């Protein structure tokens, strides 16, 4: 699958998309989440306002220096059509005309202009130039060109020289990056503070800091966008003895509906006006009055591990790149987003990452590539990279990492936005991702990810015109001498098989005679050929010598057969000796004599005399086969010798022989004893896992190989499906002499190898690309190539993953009928680790590095190790090679794990393309036509990849849930009240001192009583120790040094001691103390209660001492969400108890304004006390207030109105009817 998303409709097609934008805005805004920007286009035609047209001549323009010029599409006012115009930016004026040679140019003054993108997704790369007199909607060919124009227009505004900069100028100038959008709730302009126009609040929003503005106000907005460097912070920087610290960066207004103040935990924000503040980094929200009370140092929020703080970018290198201070960055994250991926969803993710992180660490791959970002991070010892895109985007970044040699410094994660996303599936990040609101959770998972190594492979190519392979059907007898050689090979293989396996004496004698004649003719033909083609007498003599040895071995075989014909037949009971002889012969011919003597000692002499004859025949047959091999090897050396020039090139291809003998077919299907009684092949690496249930008699033992992952055998030479096995055996018929002679011993891929003397040598090759996922040649590459071509021609048809998969299905179905590469085995030759692989009839070959192919298919057919192959893995330096028979197989493999098409597991792959025409090839979804020549796949390096660790995430989540259940709600809420080193006011210090004295008195009385009552010590020891430890933290000699964090800890512990002591003395089963001790403890307990009640008058301590009194108390975590009436009774009784304690002094009818204000405090609505006091609302008036009265008082929030009405209703129930 292609890695990057498709290019979207060209600007010429944008008119249709923009025409319906006005109708789409309202519906989209209604469906958008609260507080979120709509993703629909804001394409607007120029307003009907009158303007004075200013023109200039080409001569006047020529005198000015051009900053940027080129063709753009301009939207006209008539039906929003697009017309091509030529634009020139010179000075602070933009000129445009029909073409560059026009004499008259329209001009637009940019003195008070602002620039904004046209929409959230911005599929057509359009942008708007907004001036006080007009709006100009323009459209670029691609996103990079659009951003270049926007940057140049902004540089005019700041009077800075425009450059195709290393970084966008707005990232370092504080300028906002506008785009047009609509909103689902009332939104206010941060410039004029008025609401944005329209039902859906049309306006401009900064893509980084979400600063809102009218289109007319954007030009007056201050350059206070999100900070990127230390210089951009300015006077807000915090300096202390440890150096500089990161301050909060506050943005006013437009808070979400659920906003709560981090200081007082009350709701903040408003839909009626621009009020309250939000930090752009830690996302903390506070009231205007509480902002100064909040800790000034910003903790950077949920994503702090991934963020590079602006204070860390404090200097510049000589080459213009920012230098980071490493002490501020533990494991920073570098983000690359392909803005074209996922139907232009990448634009949305690009903006969201800039809002979460430092904008200087987020880069668009479509605007400059990955080089700039990697240069910024290259001096970090360790950093992480997140690539948001498809497999092509990942490959692009990995290739740039290779160029800068950063493999050891960085780990790379993937967020799947492309079509196939095979690598993301394997790494555990899924096959697709569309929800940009969940990015904080993704960053959190990325911080917990583990690292694995990914093998990367170089695709080396060497273009060379090679003669086409021979035809499938042999030519007429007089066509070539190769035809006669094929006849000899068939005859020798057939008659050797009959001699060794036949039980009929007449058949053996007849085959021996025919074999004798065939070998003699073969020797004569070889000698005749070499006499004609070779001028080197030494070489000719060597070949002649080998031929004489062949004749000698043939005579010895015939002599053994003649002797055997006079002996008695072998008894059936001696057949195991022949099988054992086969096992002995698999070792070496030299050891055959010793084994023969050893076997002879284990049996009786008569039996030995009868068994020697078959063993001798087998020995002679092997000797004859060895002699034939030596003739062929000698001929091969001659053909490889550069000093020898034969008349015709050697044909090393394996031809399809339709006249295969019945005997050879029988041998190809047989897995039994016939296959084991054979001759030896050329040396080959042993493979213990490759056994197929019989002796490996076809290999000579090599050096011992350690059973480790690094020393795995280089080739697995077995397959499973008998059908493919038979096809391979058939394909060998008509091949080289060695293959013919070994046909009786064939295993599926056990033909004689053409060993590459140096498998890793790539001299003369050029690196075409690097493979991370998979390589394909033939059918699948042709489908990928056609899809890529169609996407380039009609990008509007390939905008989503679903459409892309449908197109792949259509193209695959077409190939099911066309079968364009049904004879691919005739055009290519496959070698694995230097071993020549004879191919069956197929349409394609796939080489897999990861167990995911073409959008999630496990094309290898399994993930576990079996008796034949090792488990596939992307970190074992081993490739999996599979055959592609047709497109139906590719479709079926998506739902069924097929295994019959496996070919081999190896460390290098070599594919030779014959003929004059190229063959389609694809790597990781990127396809091209490869000219004839050689393709070599060799290991390049390994990359560190971040894989999702679901087991660790599950364990950590269970632990966090347990901590939440154990700690309870008050402890969970304490993080909102960490005020660090803020000193207390004088009144607050005195109140804390009184409370501490009361707590010390209570501890003293408890200790005195515990000397007599041991149970009291057991029950209260923990609370007493915790309270004493908190009180000791406060310095009694210097009470003014108390800080809020110390006061908070004291208050919490004193409250806990009070609760436990009270429950022990006046609980359901009270502890009976002696009279004096009980009285003293009760008096001390009452004093603590009084002091705690005074502490609740301090606003920031009230919600710590009375956390959420209107909610149910903490219970079992599994039942917290249970809203049944059984659990609502408890808080209701609790509220009535508190209410009676504080209002029982007098009836509601006699309440004054102070009692009403206290009642509002009980409802957590103290912000309305001033309104009630100002309108002199007393108890009698309070009982008769209705909804419309509350609205007239200026209470805007519906939830607050409902809470007040519910409280009034409860007051009415508790008040006697006579009083009302």
Curated annotation (Swiss-Prot):
It is an enzyme of class 2 (transferase). Its EC number is 2.7.1.107. It comes from the Eukaryota. The keyword Secreted does not apply. Phosphorylated. Phosphorylation does not inhibit catalytic activity. A zinc finger (Phorbol-ester/DAG-type) spans 175-225, 247-298. Its main location: cytoplasm. Residues 1151-1214 form the SAM domain. GO terms for cellular component: actin cytoskeleton; cytoplasm; endosome; intracellular membrane-bounded organelle; plasma membrane; protein-containing complex. One of its GO terms (molecular function) is kinase binding. A motif (PDZ-binding) lies at residues 1218-1220. Residues 65-158 form the PH domain. Belongs to the eukaryotic diacylglycerol kinase family. Interacts with RAF1 and BRAF. Diacylglycerol kinase that converts diacylglycerol/DAG into phosphatidic acid/phosphatidate/PA and regulates the respective levels of these two bioactive lipids. Thereby, acts as a central switch between the signaling pathways activated by these second messengers with different cellular targets and opposite effects in numerous biological processes. Plays a key role in promoting cell growth. Activates the Ras/B-Raf/C-Raf/MEK/ERK signaling pathway induced by EGF. Regulates the recruitment of RAF1 and BRAF from cytoplasm to membranes and their heterodimerization. This is Diacylglycerol kinase eta. It comes from Homo sapiens (Human). The lineage of its organism: Eukaryota, Metazoa, Chordata, Craniata, Vertebrata.
